[in-house]
Amino acid sequence: MMRLLHWVLASADSLPATFPEEWGPPPTRVERVGNGQCSVLWSDVGPNFYRRCGPTPYDEGWVVTGAASTIWRVSKGSSGSSKYAEGKWLWLDEAGALQLWERDAQNLTEDVQLAGGGSVAFVILPWNDVVTYQNRRHQFVLALQGIDFRRWGVMAVDGDSAASFATWTIDYPSRTLMITRLDCQVALFAELLDLAVGVAQEHGMDKVEIYNLPMSLQSAVAAAGGVTGERDEHLPSLKWYGNENASDVSWLLNER
């Protein structure tokens, strides 16, 4: 079934000339769908299952692309993070996070064009439910646990620092506060992280996790007590339909 998706999602000129005869009749092409430049998924069945699901028995399917996680363990007890919030940081409720993602998506469209520099790059914009679905899928569990979760992110509002922000969700079964979108100046990262840790502590989480932390913030990881490693679950995987070699394509902001 996954092999057939390529024949629905990709543009016709990027697919093989003939549909594999042994698979029976090809799937129906759906209006306004079959112009994809790429498709992505997150694998929880290892790196090879979806890789073998190509558009023919001989072509690759979705290939794992960037599965690094940076994790900060959360100690028990109250947090002093509130000392930063007043006047310098603004807490975001769900509506505030949604408004931020809308603005962010507009800005990212311009940023990706600049970042490409003649190479091929793409980004999945954080709107049209790309990020909000993660909140929705966890809200049901949070409600069952009696957790009144109101802080979905934080944004700097102090002069030139207004571009620094993070949004997150709670993955209750794994006791993780998961960063879903991050854009932060290096000088403010420790404060922002402390605010996130404070929210995690408030709701009994064991860790804060960020996927593929930006290179600009890597130097701050050790100082803040974080550990970076490769995941063996939730593996971001890419199938590129363009003429370029997939290994030459940059997936920007490969976040949660």
Give the ranges of each region predicted by the language model.
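Conserved acetyl-CoA-binding loop-helix of GNAT-fold acetyltransferases
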Residues: 1-29, 52, 186-201
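Amide-forming acyltransferase catalytic core, primarily the GNAT-like/NAT-type
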Residues: 60-178
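Short amphipathic alpha-helical surface micro-motifs
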Residues: 20-24, 47, 159-164, 190-191, ...
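Eukaryotic N-terminal low-complexity, Ser/Thr- and Lys/Arg-rich leader segments
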Residues: 17-27, 76-89, 98-99, 107-114, ...
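Intrinsically disordered, low-complexity regulatory regions enriched in Ser/Pro/Gly/Thr
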Residues: 31-34
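Active-site/acyl-donor-binding loops of N-acyltransferases
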Residues: 42, 47-80, 169-256
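Generic low-polarity alpha-helical segments
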Residues: 1-8, 21, 50, 55, ...
